[in-house]
Amino acid sequence: MKKIGIIGGTTPESTCYYYQNYIKISREKFGPFTFPELIIYSINFEEFKNNPRGWEGRTEILINAARALERAGAEIISLSANTPHIVFPEIQKAVSVPMVSIIDALIEEMRRRGVKRVLLLGTKTTMTADFYKNALREAGFDVVTPVEEEMDEIDRIIFSELAFENFEHKPYLIDLIERYAREEGIEGVILGCTELPLAIKPGDVSVEVFDTAAIHMRKLIELAAE
């Protein structure tokens, strides 16, 4: 099997969730003791999140991590968070091994489940930037995003609570999803930040839940097994 490389640390909690899915999905697919080889390069999230050079500095950090994984023998590489995919093309150009996009894996799964209209939740960057919404719309999906004040609150919950495994405002997130189901006719919700699945589970809401971290890891394991 191919060796998987993951750029982690964005945040450490979501990287742990990736690893939990790696164990669960590998056992479902291969049995109790067979796992693709996996290398995790965990970056310093403080240097990433509050980089004084903004996305130029963040991109440099991610490229250095991807190159380190390539040198370590990774044959496929991924980012373990949604927001850094804003610079996915730049990172892919910097390495010679293929990278696996969380957005491409998500689109494939959304088509498989047959949904059309979805609510996108994530960091404020993910919800407002074009890179995510445009990819989904070009693939034929209707994408709904929260209003500005809701985006601010979701972003706060992600970085101030979920990043520390604090689920105090889980009811707020559930109520928001259900309201958009009633008022906007959404058929599914994209948990477009890999911290969100730590709080929101498929049985919590009445619409399809797209856990991007689990979907991404499943795709990585499928590709590793080819």
Question: Language-model features: where?
Answer:
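Non-catalytic structural scaffold of enzyme domains
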Residues: 1-226
